[in-house]
Design a protein with these regions (language model features):
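N-terminal small/glycine-rich loop or linker at the start of catalytic domains
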Residues: 19-31, 65-85, 118, 122-126, ...
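Alpha/beta catalytic cores of nucleotide-metabolism and tRNA/nucleoside-modifying enzymes
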Residues: 1-22, 26, 36, 41-42, ...
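Glycine-rich, positively charged N-terminal anion/phosphate-binding segment
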Residues: 6-20, 35-110
Length: 344
């Protein structure tokens, strides 16, 4: 049975009109977050195919990009199937960030996104990511350099600030707009929170009030109602979903449907899930090669099947073979068994 419509939905729909990022139009602003080790080309294409308005690459280190590190170049690979898409860059030197942006523009990126939100210690220790929120002069220099370096629209992702005493996202938003940034995304936590506590969607409204740029809210959107509440509290123009897509590449589309109608769109049935899992697995093998692709796939298989009957035994089998044909056999055997149980 479908859920009753939510009274607030018409107000939200008036804000979920297409957003303009320079010359790029995003029809419905439900976005896939840049997630290290997750937002690779196979996953982005899958999420885009399910209806996400815009997808972003995992974070790419600007210096490694310039040195054409093999792994980094693979991370920066794009496909027309995922357009429009953004390549996210991290770094601390304006000149290197500008050069990396030019390289990605030449390789097919639609948008360049600048990371000033990553809380990871190794990134912060290199004075990149959210560390730049402690040095707005340096942050502004990076924004200026990247905007001037490419003809593509440039966007910025940040946190609310470094810590509770320094929530300076509104100030950085103003600097970004002056630099020519075309869209902002704000994760509703400080760097010092990491992923603890709850994202402060209400504070994001202060960032929205500080700028005329399209603003996307991010953090803790794991069910459809979260997106609605986030938009109500933040006043944002859209939402960006990260961990909520683990094992659910269709979730952004469910969010879009809920915001349009106030009703829940059911997830895929077992046959569609089998097709999705096996197709995603094959795409990872093609992208990474059989050895790395098989290894990378295991976390996704775990997320896809979490909560399904006898999934622990199935996952154990998948995790203990490196033979793609055997993995496909296990997929077929497991989902065929579930389909037969469902039909009984």
């Amino acid at each position: 049975m479908s859920s009753p419509a939510i009274e607030a939905v018409p107000d939200i729909l008036s804000r979920l009109k297409p957003i303009q990022i320079g010359p790029v139009t995003v029809d419905e602003a439900v976005l896939l977050a840049p997630m290290s080790g997750i937002s690779d080309l196979p996953f982005r294409k899958l999420v885009k195919g399910y209806g996400a308005g815009l997808v972003m690459s995992e974070m790419i280190a600007s210096q490694a990009m310039i040195y054409q590190n093999k792994r980094t170049m693979q991370m920066a690979t794009t496909s027309e199937d995922e357009y429009p898409m953004a390549v996210q860059l991290a770094g601390t030197e304006p000149e290197l960030m500008a050069e990396a942006a030019r390289l990605n523009a030449d390789r097919g990126a639609t948008i360049i996104d600048i990371n000033m939100g990553c809380p990871a210690r190794k990134v912060v220790n290199g004075y990149a990511g959210s560390a730049l929120m402690k040095d707005l002069k340096k942050a502004g220099a990076i924004l200026d350099a990247v905007v001037k370096a490419v003809d593509l629209p440039v966007t910025l992702k940040m946190r609310t600030g470094w810590d509770d005493d320094n929530r300076n996202a509104p100030e950085l938003a103003h600097i970004a707009e002056e630099s020519g940034i075309q869209m902002l995304t704000v994760h509703g936590r400080t760097r010092c929170q990491m992923y603890r506590g709850k994202a402060d969607w209400r504070f994001i409204r202060t960032v929205k009030d500080a700028t005329s740029l399209p603003l996307i809210a991010n953090g803790d959107i794991v069910v459809e109602e979260d997106a609605l509440e986030c938009l109500n509290q933040s006043g944002a123009d859209g939402v960006m979903i990260g961990r909520g897509t683990y094992g659910r590449p269709w979730f952004p589309n469910q969010v879009k449907h809920f915001l349009r109608t106030g009703e829940h769109l059911p997830g895929p049935g077992l046959q569609e899930m089998y097709d999705t899992v096996s197709g995603h697995y094959e795409a990872m093998l093609e992208h990474y090669g059989p050895v790395i692709g098989n290894r990378v796939s295991r976390k996704h298989v775990g997320w896809y099947t979490k909560g399904l009957p006898d999934s622990a035994v199935f996952r154990n089998g998948v995790n203990n073979t490196n033979n793609p044909k055997e993995v496909h056999r296990l997929f077929h055997e497991y989902f065929q068994g579930l389909l037969e149980q469902e039909a009984a």
